[in-house]
Regions:
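Residue-level signal for inorganic ion chemistry
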Residues: 31, 46, 85, 203, ...
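Short beta-strand micro-motifs enriched in acidic
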Residues: 43, 52-56, 137-141, 206-210, ...
Length: 451
């Protein structure tokens, strides 16, 4: 049995003909080669493809499509060559079906949860040009020219140029082209990810979709930049330059200076106006963020008498949208600049019943309960990794009547919800929200109540 399984297992570089059965969390197709699972990038259910194996492990392999031999009946022509929109080959209704099913499957299979209501998915308001923030990378094209775009699928060292990003607005695309034209005129070089030299690394463009404001941040290695000519070439409401010394590719950290304009971008959401610093987290789909937070408010069932803890509060978006319906809101966030923005946003909007603190939730939760009292409702909006078991225990110790969990990853929501259910909570409702059309990413909001 062992020798048969070993013989069936492909090796790196092998080419396989595969039929795709389903889509995995994360968006890759799932196929089987003599019973051995292969995750295939660039394929959808029903496709028969030729794929090359990039990684082979004992239980599964990862491969990428090199040719679609027989397309699925579901497959449609892509709107554009865009590595950031891998699901554009599926009709939008089919995307919604798959995402909703994946949320339910994760909760049932990973969390072993049952008895909850999986509510209809909230579709996106716009299938294209919905992002308010894009992060591009600089690279060198095949002819030696400077390019600005996205990483090629599965490649950390190759950047594909982007003439028109269909996830960004026309104005955002124009700004990218202005920066690229300036950089080419200056004769600047891109960061070489193999040799680890070169100047230009990333370009981050953020747009206030409801205010019209534009924020641009150029990320480079340490070195000289003609900032005066950059200011002349790029017209926006806030222009920043970040010098990054880390060898790994990241737009976070480094030394950031404001070259022109205002230090924060303004955006309107749920009747409030938010000030957003260059590195602050803000949902990248403004319209759907408003709907997501509306779902959170609905599930929180606030009547104006509750104390709400907003954990992983960021710049205060969720907490401040709930404040008008609660007695008080207390937010906690480990990133200090985000907390400063949250405090400023509360003042800016004259919200008097919201307080925000900087701290590690694992360490701060007990002191917060001792000082402020037990919360009636806890709202959590953690990163993709979800909550640690210790953070879940701290929330359970506080004994809120309701927990509203805003999740960007159902595979980490599932074990967190299972831990809460084991402690006596009931998972009542889960509603998926499609924030990111044309991609495999899915958000959802879950309600857990104390028995």
């Amino acid at each position: 049995m062992t020798s048969t399984a070993s013989a069936a297992r492909p090796s790196r570089g092998d080419e396989l003909e595969l039929t795709i059965d389903s889509l995995a969390h994360g968006g890759n197709g799932v196929a089987r080669h003599d019973g051995y699972v292969v995750f295939v990038a660039g394929a959808v259910p029903g496709d028969r493809v030729r794929a090359v194996v990039g990684k082979a492990k004992r239980a599964y392999a990862e491969a990428r499509t090199v040719e679609v031999l027989e397309p699925s009946a579901d497959r449609i022509p892509p709107a554009a060559a865009h590595p950031g929109a891998p699901w554009q080959v599926l009709p939008y209704e089919r995307q919604l079906e798959v995402k909703a099913a994946q949320v339910g499957e994760a909760l049932e299979r990973i969390g072993r949860l049952e008895g909850f209501a999986l509510e209809p998915i909230v579709p996106a308001a716009e299938p294209w040009r919905y992002r308010n923030k894009l992060e591009y990378s600089f690279g060198t094209g095949p002819g030696g020219e400077l390019v600005c775009g996205f990483h090629a699928p599965g490649r950390w060292d190759e950047i594909l140029p982007m003439d028109d990003c269909l996830l960004a607005s026309e104005r955002s695309n124009e700004l990218r082209e202005h920066v690229l034209a300036w950089a080419r005129a200056q004769g600047l070089t891109a960061w070489d990810r193999r040799e680890q030299h070169g100047l230009l690394r990333n370009l981050v463009i953020r747009e206030g979709r409801r205010t019209g404001e534009l924020q641009v941040r150029l990320v480079t290695s340490p070195g000289a930049v003609d900032t005066d000519s950059l200011v002349d070439a790029v017209r926006c409401d806030g222009l920043f330059w970040t010098r990054q010394e880390q060898l790994g590719e990241t737009s976070l950290g480094g030394d950031t200076v404001l070259l022109a304009g205002t230090p924060q971008l303004r955006e309107r959401l749920s009747g409030l106006e938010f000030l957003i610093s260059p590195e602050a987290f803000f949902q990248t789909n403004t319209e759907m963020a408003e709907r997501l937070y509306g779902v959170a408010a609905e599930l929180a069932q606030l009547r104006g008498t509750e104390r709400v803890f907003d954990l992983y509060c960021g710049i205060g978006t969720i907490g401040l949208t709930l404040a008008a319906r609660a007695r008080e809101v207390i937010g906690v966030e480990i990133v200090e600049p985000a907390v400063a923005d949250a405090i400023e946003n509360a003042r800016f909007n004259d919200v008097l019943n919201a307080r925000f603190y900087a701290g590690d939730i694992r360490l701060a939760m007990r002191d917060l309960v001792a000082e402020a009292g037990r919360p009636d409702v806890v709202v959590v909006d953690p990163p993709r990794a979800g909550l640690s078991q210790k953070v879940v225990r701290r929330i359970l110790e506080a004994q809120p009547s309701r927990i509203v969990y805003v999740s960007c990853n159902p595979t980490t929501l599932a074990p967190n919800a299972a831990q809460m259910v084991e402690a006596g909570y009931a998972l009542e409702r889960v509603r998926p929200v499609d924030m990111f059309p044309q991609t495999p990413h899915i958000e959802c909001v879950a309600l857990l109540t104390r028995g």
